[in-house]
């Protein structure tokens, strides 16, 4: 018999944490809009590097590299698919949610939230900012990678956070846009893991196989 309480408790915890973080980010939006702006962020090597974490082909290349290295392992193909699918689903989710929330990107001169009417370009996400697509892709990919390589989770999330920060610095998004995207990205990766990975998470097959290998092999 399924224990629905144990199944729903983690998602309730996620909802509460996400709600608090998103509310706090909205309170901090005016400060972030004024203080974090750096229009030349993408003229810098580190800025372009961090932005690439929100670019889907980056994760496709990483998933392909993982598959080429681990395709002979029992779950190598499944994990590679997970690494590709998590950011892909994250990006698709961002585009769909933009059509729902319809909040415009920040203005260059004045702070304030503006919404696009549903009758105005109903199927176009151009100019819409909530949630940030780059950030959602980056965090969905980082959360997926952190499940595969848990010891590197800190690095994964730091790079994704860097991607999010550059979007605020470039004035492409409000702070709340990227915080909401980060929360949703983590949820996308967690939901997919529960369906694609053994026990909802996995260690690297390389580590698993090496732990079984003989010292003389």
Regions found by a protein language model. Name each.
Residues 1-63, 98-122:
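N-terminal transmembrane-helix/juxtamembrane module of multi-pass inner/ER membrane proteins
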Residues 2-6, 11-13, 113-212, 216-217:
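Membrane-embedded catalytic cores of phosphoryl/pyrophosphoryl-handling enzymes
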Residues 10-15, 75-83, 178:
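Residue-level signature of transmembrane alpha-helical entry/exit and packing/kink sites
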Residues 20-27, 88-95, 160-171:
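Aromatic-anchored segments of alpha-helical transmembrane domains
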Residues 21, 82-90, 94, 181, ...:
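Alpha-helical transmembrane segments in multi-pass membrane proteins
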Residues 43, 74-78, 107, 149-155:
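Membrane-helix interface segments
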Residues 54-67, 134-138, 145:
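Hydrophobic alpha-helical transmembrane segments
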Residues 65-97:
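Interfacial segments of alpha-helical transmembrane regions
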